UniProtKB/Swiss-Prot annotation:
Taxon lineage: Bacteria, Pseudomonadati, Pseudomonadota, Betaproteobacteria, Burkholderiales
Disulfide bonds listed in the record: none
GO terms of biological process kind: arginyl-tRNA aminoacylation; glycyl-tRNA aminoacylation
The enzyme's E.C. designation: 6.1.1.14
Gene name tied to this protein: glyS
GO cellular component: cytosol
Molecular-function GO terms, alphabetical: arginine-tRNA ligase activity; ATP binding; glycine-tRNA ligase activity
Assembly and oligomerization: Tetramer of two alpha and two beta subunits.
Organism listed in the record: Polaromonas naphthalenivorans (strain CJ2)
Keyword flag Ligase: yes
HAMAP family reported in the protein's UniProt record: Gly_tRNA_synth_beta
Protein name (Swiss-Prot/TrEMBL): Glycine--tRNA ligase beta subunit
Pfam families: DALR_1 (PF05746), tRNA_synt_2f (PF02092)
Cellular compartment(s): Cytoplasm
InterPro entries in the record: DALR_anticod-bd, Gly-tRNA-synth_bsu, Gly-tRNA-synth_heterodimer
């Protein structure tokens, strides 16, 4: 018996475009997983998922018609329970054997066939049987039902079956969209499975308008994609369809010349791929007068509302041409082009109207209105929030550059949220900040302040750029700190995957600005300084918030490739200047490569354990008069030579050199532990030796907790 390839397709009405790829991958993945679990698919089986607006399909290679039979050994019960004193089967054993389908025509023979073997402290009876392998008919039926049940569908439809289906009029069918066809081919043979009231066959439907034949008959499983493309005018593969759209977009742009390029947006490309079965890219245009509107507005309305691809010139400026991905390919495309141009025109006109209307009022005149917009029922209005952000921004600016920066930061923070009350942002919330920059420039504010208004939301996502100037950095820090301190102060913390106020993202934003801009700001002072601006609205939760930020820092550093030990050694010290963290990590990595590192890290851990056992904090003071043993005298002398140099290097920020200098202490530290009893009976000696170790511990752990490097 040889394997053959399997093809399963579910033909449905138009599926949700944003979920299509996920649905296709899940459908194929669960089918293959179930068939492998049943022994029908092999380790060599290759799974290919297909997903188009009207179909989910899977091609699975190397599928058996029947799985191999399996020898199975099942534990029944202890011998003392299954057999009586004479060795005969008890009623309990006979009942269990009957349930397993054993032949009980000769109970004595049935019992004799059982295996006796130790099971823990007792002896047990085991039943050996041969389980018949699943057939493809039954196995695929189970796998198909499982695949449909496990599809990641947030909402399902209830619909009535067609009259030519099994059980016509049955209304309890639930699926993401009404299903109209089922294909199941093992090689060229139809597998007789049923699902959603449909019986499997060997024919499907092609393109709604352009299929050459209807229905499209499939000769075998392997001809699915080719036959569907030739006879049905459908590119079934999501990946191939996406690649074809990208190719046509690039080709259309190249034909226009002038260096124009379609905007790069992979999410939009995925969504459009999920909307068409045979893509056809067309070039359209709109009136140049609309280019007076900020291009972000035009690009957003074309992408979000119409799923168009705007064209940018070589300088990145929007042109008045755009690309449409059509699902039809008529000989004369002028009607399709004209229709799309007519549809987009009102959208662009609305954007122009909003832009013109918004500029009739200044941003400053809108700030007062923020007092009527509720931010949070416990934290007040957007107006109150604006005042808090401005106050925090001024404090941060004073720490960085003094009054000059503070004045600019205060003004930018005061204006930063005013565009929330504009018509454009009301229509397109994604443009908050961006429109604030345009309106600030129109009102005569400096480019620096205008940029800060736009940038104070940055970074908005992983990998996003940081604010472009110091004013923007200050306001962005203030905005994020206000959110974090306020939400923690009212106990509104993220839980699990729920983070409605994006506190994790805000924490990472604070971290990135402090680290990547290498700002000379202490994290504790920033958080502690932000809390008083809330007055009695919050409870000070600074310790919890700092722990949260350090936790996000640890996760971020591990994602960047640092080991858990490296990260833990640095972050456990809770460094106040996050800008120092990369240098500390580099120093730890360089130290770990030294031959002295393992011994010193282990010694550091040992010292820490000794000091932890003391009820009171150990005084690092050392009296030379109480140094008796040669090893402790040598260690003290070595520390006097090494530690001042290491401290000086630390103070100048040369953390790598500081740790490398301390590596010279390895030999005297080893000798100390080999030759000195720390907890001597004499109290003064014991305290002096503990003080020596405390002094050493302090010196060794300024850059990082070296004990965390011990595996």
């Amino acid at each position: 018996m040889t394997t053959k390839n399997l093809l399963v397709e579910l033909f449905v009405e138009e599926l949700p475009p944003k979920a299509l790829k996920k649905l296709g991958d899940a459908f194929a993945g669960v089918l293959a997983e179930q068939l492998k679990a049943l022994g029908l698919a092999t380790a060599e089986s290759v799974v290919t998922a297909y997903a188009s607006p009207r179909r989910l399909a899977a091609h699975i290679s190397h599928v058996w018609l029947k799985a191999d039979d399996k020898a199975v050994q099942q534990k029944l019960m202890p011998v003392s329970v299954g057999l009586d004193s004479a060795g005969h089967a008890t009623p309990a054993l006979l009942k269990r054997l009957q349930a397993l389908g054993a032949d009980l025509s000769d109970p004595v023979a049935a019992v004799a066939a059982l295996k006796r073997a130790p099971d823990g402290k007792a002896e047990a009876l085991f039943y050996n049987s041969l389980v018949t392998g699943a057939t493809l008919d039954t196995g695929l039926q189970k796998a198909l039902e499982e695949a449909i049940a496990k599809l990641p569908i947030p909402k399902v439809m209830s619909y009535q079956l067609e009259t030519d289906c099994e059980l016509p009029g049955w209304t309890s069918v639930n699926f993401v969209r009404p299903a109209h066809g089922l294909v199941a081919l093992h090689g060229s043979t139809v597998v007789p499975v049923k699902v959603l009231g449909l019986k499997a066959g060997n024919s499907t439907r092609g393109h709604r308008f352009e299929a050459a034949v209807d229905p499209v008959v499939l000769a075998d499983a392997d001809s699915y994609a080719v036959t569907l493309e030739i006879d049905g005018a459908v590119i079934a593969s999501f990946a191939q369809r996406k690649a074809e759209i990208a190719r046509q977009l690039a080709e259309a742009a190249a034909e226009l010349g002038g260096g124009v390029q379609p905007i790069e947006d992979d999410a939009l490309l995925d969504e459009v791929t999920a909307l068409v079965e045979r893509p056809n890219v067309l070039v359209c245009e709109f009136e140049k007068e609309f280019l007076d509107v900020p291009q972000e507005c035009l690009i957003l309305t074309m992408k979000a509302n119409q799923k168009y691809f705007p064209l940018l010139d070589a300088a990145g400026k929007l042109t008045n041409k755009f690309l449409v991905v059509s699902n039809i390919s008529p000989e004369d495309a002028s009607f399709v082009i004209g229709g799309n141009e007519r549809v987009v025109r009102p959208r662009l006109a609305d954007a122009k109207f909003f832009f013109d209307q918004d500029r009739k009022r200044t941003l400053a005149s809108r700030v007062e209105g923020l007092g009527k917009v509720v931010y949070h029922n416990k934290l007040g209005t957007q107006g109150e929030r604006t005042e808090r952000v401005a106050e925090i921004a001024v404090k941060i600016a004073q720490l960085l550059e003094g009054d000059a920066l503070a004045g600019k930061a205060g003004k930018a923070a005061w204006l930063a949220k005013a565009d929330l009350l504009t018509d454009m942002v009301g229509e397109f919330p994604e443009l908050q900040g961006t429109m604030g920059r345009y309106y600030a420039l129109h009102d005569g504010h400096s480019a620096e302040i205008a940029a800060a208004i736009e940038d104070h939301y940055k970074p908005r996502f992983a990998g996003d750029e940081l604010p472009r100037n110091p004013v923007g950095v200050v306001v962005a820090l203030a905005d994020k700190l206000e959110t974090l301190v306020g939400m923690f102060g009212i106990g509104n913390l993220p839980t699990g995957d729920k983070d409605p106020f994006a506190l994790r993202r805000h924490a990472l934003g604070v971290i990135r600005m402090l680290v990547e801009k290498d700002l000379p700001l202490d994290l504790g002072a920033l958080v502690g300084g932000a809390a008083p601006v809330f007055g009695d609205k919050i409870t000070d939760a600074t310790p919890a918030l700092l722990d949260f930020i350090y936790d996000r820092l640890s996760g971020s550093l591990r994602e960047q490739g640092y080991s858990a030990q490296e990260v833990d050694s640095v972050v456990s010290q809770k460094p106040q200047r996050l800008g120092d963290v990369p240098k500390r990590l580099a120093a730890v990595r360089a130290f770990a490569a030294l031959p002295e590192a393992p011994a010193l890290a282990a010694a550091n851990k040992r010292i820490g354990n000794i000091l932890k056992k003391e009820a009171l904090e150990v005084d690092p003071h050392v009296s030379e008069l109480l140094l008796r043993e040669a090893a402790e005298i040598a260690l003290y002398a070595a520390m006097r030579d090494v530690v001042p140099t290491a401290n000086a290097q630390f103070d100048t920020g040369d953390y790598t050199a500081s740790l490398q200098t301390l590596a010279a202490l390895r030999a005297p530290v080893d000798a100390f532990f080999d030759g000195v009893m720390v907890n001597a009976e004499e109290l003064d000696l014991r305290l002096n030796r503990q003080g020596l170790l405390k002094s050493l511990h302090n010196a060794m752990n300024r850059v990082a907790d070296l004990s965390r490097l011990v595996a």
